[in-house]
């Protein structure tokens, strides 16, 4: 577990991609640096497509798992305002401090709860979320199937889990989601390097009659 935790901690500190990794090197970066980093990420990753896949709107409650320094979190917060909520989880409290700084600069801090969680636990309360986002994080779980099964308990009826990751992780992510009892609703590749897959919880009756 210590080896796994160290790997996950490194991932959390690096963020969701190389661009986000730069953000964790110093908490004293200028506002201009943060803005340039965000603009580069937005151009490369098209985060509006992730928001669209989540199906969130004003008033929604969404979990951003492994949120890192918040390059995607800011977009989720904008989508759910003025009366929604984003719960941003990570195993590293220091990187969530960077997230807080990014949100404060954007005037979105009041919409986001930062939550430090254990490496192998979702840390989300039951039946409380319209959507759960896993962006470039699911392949690091030692038991992805068990994690996803636990996470489904946090969804409201009709809620969805969205997995976004690099293309070379697609097969593993899809297989784990299927084994966890999730039903694929849609899939897209808004940029050549990443896929977005939308899942809902399969009905218990889907496999047979009464």
Regions found by a protein language model. Give the residues of each.
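Bacterial signal peptide processing site
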Residues: 14-17
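Conserved class I S-adenosyl-L-methionine
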Residues: 59-68
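A short glycine-rich, Lys/Arg-flanked "PGG" loop and its adjoining helix->strand segment in the class I
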Residues: 77-78, 145-160
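Conserved SAM/SAH-binding beta-strand->alpha-helix loop
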Residues: 92
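Conserved SAM-binding strand-loop segment of SAM-dependent methyltransferases
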Residues: 107-120
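A short acidic, Gly/Pro-enriched loop at the edge of an enzyme's catalytic core
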Residues: 120-132
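A short SAM/SAH-binding and catalytic strip from SAM-dependent methyltransferases
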Residues: 130-144
């Amino acid at each position: 577990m210590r080896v796994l935790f160290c790997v996950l901690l490194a991932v959390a500190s690096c963020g969701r991609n190389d661009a986000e990794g730069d953000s964790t090197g110093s908490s004293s970066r200028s506002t201009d640096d943060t803005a340039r980093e965000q603009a580069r990420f937005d151009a490369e990753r098209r985060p509006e497509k992730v928001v669209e896949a989540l199906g969130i709107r004003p008033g929604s409650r969404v979990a951003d798992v492994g949120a890192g320094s918040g390059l995607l979190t800011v977009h989720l917060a904008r989508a759910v305002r003025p009366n929604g909520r984003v719960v941003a989880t990570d195993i590293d409290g220091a990187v969530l401090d960077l997230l807080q700084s990014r949100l404060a600069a954007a005037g979105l801090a009041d919409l986001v709860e930062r939550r430090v969680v254990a490496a192998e636990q979702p840390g989300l309360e039951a039946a409380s979320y319209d959507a759960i986002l896993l962006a470039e994080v699911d392949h690091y779980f030692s038991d992805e199937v068990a994690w996803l099964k636990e996470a489904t308990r946090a969804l409201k009826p009709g809620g969805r889990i969205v997995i976004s990751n690099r293309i070379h992780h697609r097969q593993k992510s899809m297989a784990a989601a299927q084994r966890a009892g999730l039903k694929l609703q849609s899939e897209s590749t808004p940029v050549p390097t990443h896929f977005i897959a939308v899942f809902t919880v399969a009905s218990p009756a889907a496999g047979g009659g009464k």
